[in-house]
Regions:
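Long, contiguous binding/interaction regions
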Residues: 1-122
């Protein structure tokens, strides 16, 4: 099953990219090698009903469910994971996909994160 993905507002994408650049700069400062694929988590705020739709769509892009949490204000968060590099092109594509999922499912994309990968052996 393939989805017709909605176009993303370029101003919103640019705003997200500013936040993404800060995350990438922090990773680089910690010795990250961006081309190394690793688990990357993304989160969405919404309702349990919305999350079921998110899972159906996101699974088509290789995301798996990590966790669901409720914060102190009662907001529900869904955490998903995929494995990918974190170079600029990969993160721009990830953010675009997440914003499209946000639009299709009525949830709020809350960002992404990962651990720095230096290429060293532990």
């Amino acid at each position: 099953m393939s989805q017709n993905l909605p176009p993303v507002d370029e101003a919103r994408l640019a705003a997200e990219w500013e936040a993404d650049r800060q995350v990438l700069a922090n990773l680089a400062a910690n010795g990250d090698v961006a081309r190394i694929a690793r688990p990357v988590d993304v989160s969405f705020r919404g309702s349990e009903q919305d999350f079921e739709r998110v899972l159906i769509i996101a699974s088509q892009f290789g995301f798996v469910e990590l966790d669901r949490e409720e914060d102190e204000d009662g907001d529900l968060f869904l955490f998903l994971e995929c494995v990918q590099p974190v170079d600029e092109q990969s993160i721009r594509a990830l953010t675009r996909k997440c914003l499209q999922i946000e639009m299709m499912c009525g949830v709020e994309y809350d960002g992404w994160g990962c651990e720095a990968q230096t290429g060293g052996v532990h």
